[in-house]
Amino acid sequence: SNSHIQIEEKQFFEKNELKIILDLYAKMVSEGSWKDYGLNISSKQVSFSVFKNAAENALYKICKNFKPKNKNLKYLITDTSGKILKNSFDLKTLLKNTSWKKLQ
């Protein structure tokens, strides 16, 4: 019997987290601030990258850490090089209180 074999679950944004991010993305696109996005998944985190245009590096990455060292590092906004610009234990709070134009 193979019942002891665990199928590794691919970790990702939860459905409600993705909705929060995509709602923000749609708003920023309609304002002309963002033009494109990308998703990256590793064993440690998933990130949603936003681009001003396709030829450039990502402006920002909205990241979710699967096993953060402390709960305030669960959700991050980083720049292209991975420097943490903002962090929170709550995604909605993190994004709602962000002034994107002033972030860099």
Q: Model-found features: residue ranges?
A:
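Short aromatic-glycine-(Arg/Gly/Cys) micro-motifs in beta-strand/loop hairpins
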Residues: S1-N2, Y60-S81
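Hydrophobic residues embedded in beta-strands of well-ordered beta-sheets
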Residues: V46-F48, Y75
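Local beta-strand/beta-hairpin segments that build beta-sheet-rich folds
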Residues: N57-Y60, L85
